[in-house]
Amino acid sequence: MTWLPEWRVTVGDDVYTTVTSVSFASGRLDIDRQATAGYCQVEIINTDGSAFTINVTEPITLELKNSSGTYVTVFGGEVSDFNIGVRSPEESGYITTGKILGIGSLAKLTKVVYNTALAEGLDGAQISAILGNALNLTWAEVTPTVTWATYPADVTWANAESYIGTIDSGFYTMINLAASATAKSQTLADQIATSALGQIYEEKDGDVSYDDADHRSNYLATNGFTNLDGSYATPSSIQSTTQTARIRNSLIYRYGASYGSTYSTSDSDSIASYGLFERSFDSNIKNLADITDIASRELNLRKNPRGSLGAITFRLDNPDIPSAMLDSLIGVFFGQPVLINNLPSNLLGGSFDGFVENIALRATPSFVEITLYISATDFSLSTTQWETVTPASLIWTGVNGTLTWTNASGALT
């Protein structure tokens, strides 16, 4: 099919469709770290000399039409920088351009200190407290030009200036933390999320959400993988990488109150084969049983070197790409399970399944490419707790008769 990008950029109350270039990125490039603030760069054309009414700190939303002509939101944030330039003089006057730099809501966490004590509780509850403090704005923090008349009719005072999406309840019990006058919200939230095997990230509309440890397992069991045909990928973007830097065969965890307890584990066979690759961690996990499970999982995943796909790039303007796949790529989101098939047979066995960790896009009026960074599936699967899943959609049938609940990660149907 023939498809060319049609953009709709909304800044505050203003809508722009004369877009000449777009780029954005959101997510993380390292599964050992939490996502960082996304960004977008947009250039729009002004041919009539009218005044630009774009202000810094105003919300910005990028939408892209899919194959059926429906606009799909692909990025949300707020304006950080705005620049007006001249493209070329015309007989009727100058043609000017507006260049917008937008940043994601996670950037707000770097600017806010969380100076309140955190009680012992599930990771989701602690994350909710930190995000609520940083991302629920007061009226004094709202862009000065904004009035109540600009809000949709269904918006209430309680949620008018909230940048919080969905926060899972949590999977692990975390230690309590004393109040600190210097605790950065981002550092604190990242430490809790990483300790609990969760992910903090930006939704496509700009809100910040938190997925706890079994979120991806449950989503995969309910929805399965989205299939993407690797034969439509840019060939030079496809590569498998195996690194010694990813090996971990000796682990030391400092956990519990004030990180005063220590748990260690190692794999002698891996050490004999590859040498010692030791890592130590400060974990906010409270209980020994939990830290034991986390350490065992990490050791099993990392004790042997393994190939990984990493990033893969697709041209959305490829006339041969099927409409369904085009729409899947436009709608792709952080944490989505995908299966890349039709890869070379001598590269990862010809297919790779995993979860989307980062999305980056570059576009001109005639060119669009999207690059996905994908982590292997088993790095995101965890031991499922029955109380955190939906019994109506997950049933204990169709599995091997010898399978126990303890080992049922990813096996439910």
Language-model regions: role of each:
Residues 68-71, 88-242:
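Charged- and aromatic-enriched interaction segments used to assemble
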Residues 74-84, 351-362:
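Short beta-strand-centered aromatic/proline hotspots
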Residues 38-40, 173, 310:
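Short amphipathic alpha-helical segments
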Residues 1-16, 119-121, 125, 187-353, ...:
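Acidic, small/polar-enriched beta strand-loop surface segments
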Residues 19, 79-81, 233-236, 356:
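A structural signal for short, hydrophobic beta-strand segments that form beta-sheets
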Residues 42, 192, 356:
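Terminal peptide-recognition signature
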Residues 2-8, 12-16, 25, 30-41, ...:
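Surface-exposed cap/loop segments at beta↔alpha junctions
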Residues 55-59, 181-182, 333-341:
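Glycine-centered loop/turn motifs
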